[in-house]
Amino acid sequence: MTIIRKKHPLIKIINHSFIDLPTPSNISSWWNFGSLLGLCLIIQILTGLFLAMHYTSDTATAFSSVAHICRDVNYGWLIRYMHANGASMFFICLFMHVGRGIYYGSYNMIETWNMGIVLLFAVMATAFMGYVLPWGQMSFWGATVITNLLSAIPYIGTTLVEWIWGGFSVDKATLTRFFAFHFILPFIITALVLVHLLFLHETGSNNPTGLNSDTDKIPFHPYYTIKDFLGVLLLLMAFMILTLFFPDILGDPDNYTPANPLNTPPHIKPEWYFLFAYAILRSIPNKLGGVLALILSILILALMPLLHTSKQKTLTFRPITQTMYWILVADLLILTWIGGQPVEYPFIIIGQAASIAYFTIIVILMPIAGMIENNILDLD
């Protein structure tokens, strides 16, 4: 078996990636989220495949086809709710994974980090298009509002929006193409994940100390396979509790009403995992400015390697930057809350303050904190 494992052209790749991979001996449970994201992707592809067998991407029948899946298809309700809540679990793991990367300075592995940002954008695009497919009220109006943001692009904006819509409004053509893209993107994401892993295995994993761990590596299997398996069990337990006991807790009641272009819902908002970016978008009164802030709220992650001023890689031994980091986490939670609130006082001013704080902490305060810590520790 050992000979096949190390000699066979295909199994050899798997062996070097998941079995004999030299791994730092001290990586914590925060490093589990990569494998959990892989699990989430597999769950989403499988449940999505079975949903696609029964779904029809036509404005006249899309809503009723989802109802048909839940009522008439064997375990259709389970597949549908696993897919809907699987997206939420996916984003929880994504945010934890990115948060770990920021805390432990993993952004210094630039190729891996940049590929991660591309993956984040791809997953967000996939989730957005998936939310449109049930063709409920929030699906329709969410698609209308978010795609309409592109009209803020000077000169070509309006043409671009109509090109994406396939007409003069969100209609059958839009739904059909969104379904096509929603189906193909997870497979593109899978390919990007392999590139992400390829870049990671060029440098090897980071660790909580941020120090070089070449002298203290252990094989991935069995140590981290068993550790990842525990993470998988915990994730599946939380996932099935969410899916079986509280399937609609993260959804919007408006999406149980069929799409009606003549009736606007009182509060148009995306799924919970986009609310922080939506709050940043809404906090700027200018349309183009809002769109730029929305894109920058994610793209700012690409600046992290340039904004790293500390002589230490991680935040493990840096209490000032640690404080900034946890304020940033709290700020993101505030933005998520604000994104789900109506556009009125005091939510507008809180959203604007939280948006300013978000960019200020990342661009100004964390780099300054890094320099202060260098001086305190006399590392310059």
Swiss-Prot record:
Entry's localization field: Mitochondrion inner membrane
Cofactor dependence: heme b
Annotated membrane topology: Multi-pass membrane protein
Superkingdom to which the source organism belongs: Eukaryota
Residues holding a ubiquinone: H201
Keywords: Electron transport, Heme, Iron, Membrane, Metal-binding, Mitochondrion, Mitochondrion inner membrane, Respiratory chain, Transmembrane, Transmembrane helix, Transport, Ubiquinone
Binding locations of heme b b562: H83, H182
Spans traversing the lipid bilayer: 33-53, 77-98, 113-133, 178-198, 226-246, 288-308, 320-340, 347-367
Any one Gene Ontology molecular-function term assigned to this protein's record: ubiquinol-cytochrome-c reductase activity
Pfam families: Cytochrom_B_C, Cytochrome_B
Classification via SUPFAM superfamilies: a domain/subunit of cytochrome bc1 complex (Ubiquinol-cytochrome c reductase), Transmembrane di-heme cytochromes
Cellular component GO terms, alphabetical: mitochondrial inner membrane; respiratory chain complex III
Free-text cofactor note: Binds 2 heme b groups non-covalently.
Residues annotated as binding heme b b566: H97, H196
GO biological process: mitochondrial electron transport, ubiquinol to cytochrome c
Other information: Heme 1 (or BL or b562) is low-potential and absorbs at about 562 nm, and heme 2 (or BH or b566) is high-potential and absorbs at about 566 nm.
Family assignment from sequence similarity: Belongs to the cytochrome b family.
Description of how the protein assembles with itself and partners: The cytochrome bc1 complex contains 11 subunits: 3 respiratory subunits (MT-CYB, CYC1 and UQCRFS1), 2 core proteins (UQCRC1 and UQCRC2) and 6 low-molecular weight proteins (UQCRH/QCR6, UQCRB/QCR7, UQCRQ/QCR8, UQCR10/QCR9, UQCR11/QCR10 and a cleavage product of UQCRFS1). This cytochrome bc1 complex then forms a dimer.
Purpose of the protein: Component of the ubiquinol-cytochrome c reductase complex (complex III or cytochrome b-c1 complex) that is part of the mitochondrial respiratory chain. The b-c1 complex mediates electron transfer from ubiquinol to cytochrome c. Contributes to the generation of a proton gradient across the mitochondrial membrane that is then used for ATP synthesis.
Protein name: Cytochrome b
